[in-house]
């Protein structure tokens, strides 16, 4: 299982690597017959970013292995209650493509929950302006004409 770990940009390199190892251990405990590989978003960005943010975000979801043709990532995992613009775009695109996206509580063995939507809550906050929803999207009251 190949996992894209969507961590906060504010995490230090050390913290990101530690959490990626914890995520790998948590997923391996839940899937003992599978080899688990976790790649933090920062590592993917450093290795694959070619100067265009929108293209890189789509590429994370659509990129395939040159040899096998299979998607580079089988699953996408996010941590926290909110995320930034790039993470929101990646995860929303993954959801649109029917790819599995899960929220993780950051612990081992930890809890995993399916992400249903990611909605903009503050468009001016590019680091935390999107809210991760684990249940069906919240209902919105339509404006009445009177």
For the regions a protein language model found, what residue spans apply to each?
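Conserved catalytic or regulatory cores that recognize and/or transform ribose-phosphate-containing ligands
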Residues: 1-146
């Amino acid at each position: 299982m190949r996992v894209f770990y969507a961590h906060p940009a504010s995490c230090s390199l050390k913290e990101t690597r530690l959490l990626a190892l914890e995520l790998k251990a948590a997923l391996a405990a839940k899937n003992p017959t599978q080899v688990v590989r976790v790649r933090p978003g920062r590592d993917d960005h450093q290795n694959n970013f070619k100067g265009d943010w929108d293209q890189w975000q789509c590429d994370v979801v659509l990129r395939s292995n040159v040899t096998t043709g299979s998607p580079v990532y089988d699953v996408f995992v996010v941590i926290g209650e909110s995320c930034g613009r790039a993470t929101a775009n990646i995860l929303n695109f993954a959801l649109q493509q029917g790819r599995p996206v899960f929220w993780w509580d950051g612990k081992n063995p930890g809890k995993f929950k399916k992400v249903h939507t990611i909605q903009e809550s503050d468009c001016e906050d590019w680091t935390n302006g999107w809210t991760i929803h684990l249940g069906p999207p919240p209902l919105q009251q339509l404006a009445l004409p009177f």
